[in-house]
Amino acid sequence: MAPPPDTSGSCSAFHECERIFAQWGYPFQDYSESFRQSLDTVCRCSRFFLGVVKRDAHVIPLLASLFEGQTPERNPSADLQQRVAEVADRNGLMRVLRQWRNREMAIIAWQDICGLLDIDSVLTRISETAESAIRTALDWLFDDACRRWGVPRRKDGSAQSLVVLGMGKLGGYELNFSSDIDLVFAYVEDGELPGRNGATYAEFYTRLAQSLVHVLDAVTEDGFVFRVDVRLRPFGESGPLVVSFDSCERYYQAQARDWERYAMVKVRAVGGDAKDGREFERFFHPFVYRRYLDYRVFGELRSLKARIMAELRRKDRGDNIKLGAGGIREIEFIGQAFQLIRGGRNVELQDRRILVVLERLGRLRLLEHGTASFLCAAYRFLRKVENRLQQYEDKQTHELPVSEERRGLLAFSMGFESWEGFLHRLDEVRRRVHEIFTEVIAEPPQPARGEPLLDGGEAELSQALAGFDGAAEAMTGALVKFRASAPVRRLGAGARAELQRVIGKLLAELAAFRVSDPVGVLGRILELFESIAGRGVYFSLLAENPSALSQLVRLAAASPWIVRLIAGAPILLDELLDPRTLYSPLTRESLGREADILFSSLAPDDDEQLMLRLRQFKAAHQLRIAAADIMNVIPVMVVSDYLTDLAEVVIERVLRLAWKFAAARHGIPPVEAETSVDFPGFGIIAYGKLGGIELGYGSDLDLVFLYDGVASDAVTDGPRPISAAEFYARVVQRMVSLLTADMPGGALYEVDLRLRPSGSSGLLVSKADAYENYQLHQAWTWERQALVRARFVAGDPKVGARFDAIRRNVLCRERDSRQVRLDVRSMREKMREHLADRRPGVFDLKQGVGGIADIEFIVQFGVLISAAKHCEITRWTDTVRLLDSLRAINFLELGQADRLRCAYCDYRGRVHRLALQEMPALAASSEFPGHRTAVEAVWKQIIEAPVF
């Protein structure tokens, strides 16, 4: 770094360096020109540094060694501990701490100003310096206090130290150069010290904390160690200096204010017993990171920011680079807003370091990638400016200098040739930061409809709804009924105000969207609001995000099923925030990765939370699929693909839980061949719509369970051994229980196990050999029809391969086509008689003549009588690809296959849409005449052909 132009008061820095060298007896010319230049530069930019090298003879040779790379890896903390071990009293402790601190901070200032450390490393080094000082001082003071007053002990007899919690920038390894440190003091167990007049532990730890604050904070002839702020403790300045774990728990559960969550985002134990410190950190976690999405954070941050700005204006300190517009605090608020809203559900955001959080916000697309990158760069720039301001005199300032000399030095130290160039860059950064802050945190514009719709009379409501013409009266009635409902009447003032905002915006959206049935859509959404009224945070979400409310109106207009889905899992409202993800269902691999991330934040033994989270996961992705379906983003066949992928991911996760549950009690059965798979010897076979990759929105799961590769007399290897068959049966029982349990959000899936060998009277899990024997020698034709659509979906791949071989062997057998035709026709007639809706004017899309079941039976018949000569057609399990396969072997003519495929896809599409409308799979008898005629013709030609 070239020296700055000589300015008054700084031109003598070089000569001052020469005098200092001479003072300590170091030959000035023996050091390299570049090293001497670095000292000159830093002495110009930091009076603090100049003062330290004047007082401490050891600094210059240490810096020279560092500069030339001749010093082995330093351990400042160990150096401090060694020095403190030699002190005899508190005055000696204070002197050693200050001298050590000044030396370390001078080294950091030199490395920072000369560009030898990046700003991230500088902030970390300062934080580590503070933590070393805290830990070392506390250890000395604790030992001293124990000698004086006795040792506080736990119930198990071990010594119990004070726990020191670092808040704010100290906790996040982000301390600036002349920062104060925010500390909270706590201890785990209450008690009394030994002795006739023994003090309580509270008194002991209070004295200890007071001593620590004094040792660190007091200003002596050697300066201070770190300024200490203890106002973030429970009850603030009016509360005790030290709190017990129980008191702390009661406070944060019942009395803590919302703004205290922000202070706790970075909390970290920085002194005392490490195990106790981790316990305190874990305690704060649920207070900071809520399990639900708390959009009230935006309003709270706006209020806090407004108070800060008002205070700055009052003190005429608007040019503050930390608290002013576009300053450091606004960047921190942006990151913390997302942490506090989403951190409870997204473990990646549970990080103390703001730069890590911002980077992850970009990666998770919660912020635009470019925006996140800019904020990281802006944060580093502003923190560098902050350090330069404070390094000058070791003062805690955030104000830009006024004098020409100081301005020139600041610009130079930041790498700019002029103050004007630096200020231009600073203003650019702050302007863009403030723009982003406003976009993220600022209150959204209010709609024109601002009437007190929850409190006014019917006349005001009618006036507000005048633009809806004939629907106004019915909508007025719906709103009157809604606001009189018990959940709405019980709302607190804050939630009621948020709901007031939402209702006004809702009516504006209904008018702007020109909903064809505003009464019905309003009614659905009001029912949803009534069901979520106990969680006012969801009203905050909709009030803060007009686009989410807009998406809700569109989806509610298209599907009451979606509204009911959201009512069962209100967390889904968060999915409406970003149309890019709302209308973009995930692939099988992406679903698996998201599930892994989602569950990684939960305790592995917390099955209840795992299952609740799994229900939310399933519902969120069902919503994405339905939204993309409604908006015609994906075709009908892909809808079923996505629903099938989702079900498979859920099944795999439930299998993991069930397996873990059984294995913890009984161990696992030994398999005959060595394997490293997760579920040795066990496989899940999907039948029906899941097996055929044709799942619908309300489909249940037809499942069959197999085991293989396990000796018939094998037992598990755990503390309570059971037979292999019994172990696998318990896994299945647990799986079914988890899948069908009625929890908030409903069951995951309904499960049907009747397609297993011997149906409801058969074993829950079949040995593969027995399953094969049953399929070959005992199964009915309809069971072999079902096998056409069966496939392996989870478990041991070896069991999957065994099942594939069994299925191929069974399906590719020679059959009497005459008997198969009779069986298929008979079964279909029974189904029509018992399942079809035969009312006049109605066409049953699934069971009616010429409907879906007829197409599926034609395909299954074709496979059963053709696979012996064309075994390759058994490769597929879904109807559409089987139609193509049957066309390829000339079982179907080209026109027949095309007409059946077209009819099948159109029918399935209508069934999906009806499910979203919560309507049965029925159409008017006048609909689909061409499809019905075509299917009937093929049915008659193939299934009802004369049997001789």
From Swiss-Prot:
Catalytic activity, EC: 2.7.7.89, 2.7.7.42
A single Gene Ontology CC term: cytosol
UniProt-recorded name of the protein: Bifunctional glutamine synthetase adenylyltransferase/adenylyl-removing enzyme
Cofactor(s) the protein requires to work: Mg(2+)
Species for this entry: Methylococcus capsulatus (strain ATCC 33009 / NCIMB 11132 / Bath)
CDD domains referenced in this protein's UniProt entry, alphabetically: NT_GlnE_GlnD_like (cd05401)
Pfam families assigned to the protein according to its UniProt record, in alphabetical order: GlnD_UR_UTase, GlnE
Family, as annotated: Belongs to the GlnE family.
Keyword Nucleotide-binding: yes
GO MF terms held by the record: [glutamate-ammonia-ligase] adenylyltransferase activity; [glutamine synthetase]-adenylyl-L-tyrosine phosphorylase activity; ATP binding; magnesium ion binding
Function: Involved in the regulation of glutamine synthetase GlnA, a key enzyme in the process to assimilate ammonia. When cellular nitrogen levels are high, the C-terminal adenylyl transferase (AT) inactivates GlnA by covalent transfer of an adenylyl group from ATP to specific tyrosine residue of GlnA, thus reducing its activity. Conversely, when nitrogen levels are low, the N-terminal adenylyl removase (AR) activates GlnA by removing the adenylyl group by phosphorolysis, increasing its activity.
